[in-house]
Amino acid sequence: MNSILSSVLPAPEDPVLSVIFACRDDPSPVKLNLSAGTYRTEEGKPLVLDVVRRAEQQLANDLDKEYLPLNGLPEFNKLSTKLILGDDSPALKENRVVTTQCLSGTGSLRVGAEFLATHNKESVIFVPNPTWGNHPRIFTLAGLSVQYFRYYDPKSRGLDFKGMLEDLGAAPPGAIVVLQACAHNPTGVDPTFEQWEKIRRLVRSKSLLPFFDSAYQGFASGSLDADAQAVRMFVADGGECLIAQSYAKNMGLYGERIGSLTIVCTSEDVAKKVENQVLLVVRPMYLTPPIHGASIVATILKNSDMYNDWTIELKGMADRIISMRQQLYAALEARGTPGDWSHIIKHIGMFTFTGLSEEQVRLMAKEYHIYMTYDGRISMASLSSKTVPQLADAIHAVVTRIA
């Protein structure tokens, strides 16, 4: 009998999952996984925010399990839009914003990509080099042609701002540009406010369409407003943009898959047409989104006491990550580790490019049981005061051994 499925080829190795599996299979009691993008406490445990537990307790008696509308929970959409754009956003006042609840950041990006592939005449999308590993796959599968613009400078371990402007300046009018709103993944390198303004001017002068990935609002600096600054700058000029939001990191709702796609249009009339077309994308994809995560977020955002408590817990997470950066830098300096490690405290958010080579990274795993992606990215949120010395010792050893 002929087998249709026997001709299926093996899938290519996922660079992040392969590291996670290697760490899982390592029997060492001191193994350390710095590859996954999830927050951990000082004790190395997953964190459920107290305010999330309170919201769930409140919902336990009130929540039904009916289908949501295609565009999701209306209350969630309204509150989520205000969170990213600000209460006083002119785009909101002029009713030219469309928000659709989606399946976290990934789902929001995919719905936006499918919409753009159908309705944007220029099908090329520019993403940073490097960028989150899932970005190219999401956009390619949606039918967009992915190209890259320079972003990270390995020599300075900072932003290649000149290269970025040159590449975006050469992009064709109408091209889509993916911009991470804050806490760039995987590098931890963000533009300054002044650099963002120059990026905005270039994007608008070239008639490019910005698509923001906002996965870490409040998780980078500890301030929800500061981390939305770049997005609001683009919205304030009256132009168009798309924004994918996620509550996986800033509310710890990883498994609830809760996010939203917001599309800022030039007029209310355009927004109405865009809304209907987005729903045509959603309907055959998953029909309606889940209710539980959206209800948690809406409960927290609409209650002033809960919102306040959330901002305190959120700042606590951001501050702990900043502290891990400071401790790691100090530990490397104390050991006299060769090289300049100041980029660790200059970077922001969950991730940092260490600057380690693939050879050094593999040695870290083999001899020191410390796992990170092969490009040298580590999750600062997975470190603790107890494991910083362990990491610093290993980095010092491999850098000294392999120049």
Swiss-Prot record:
This is Aspartate aminotransferase, cytoplasmic isozyme 2. It comes from Arabidopsis thaliana (Mouse-ear cress). It comes from the Eukaryota. Belongs to the class-I pyridoxal-phosphate-dependent aminotransferase family. It is an enzyme of class 2 (transferase). Homodimer. PANTHER family: ASPARTATE AMINOTRANSFERASE (PTHR11879), ASPARTATE AMINOTRANSFERASE, CYTOPLASMIC ISOZYME 2 (PTHR11879:SF41). Pfam families: Aminotran_1_2 (PF00155). Its EC number is 2.6.1.1. L-aspartate binds at G37, W132, N185, R377. One of its GO terms (biological process) is 2-oxoglutarate metabolic process. PROSITE patterns: AA_TRANSFER_CLASS_1 (PS00105). It is found in: Cytoplasm. Disulfide bonds: none annotated. GO terms for cellular component: cytoplasm.
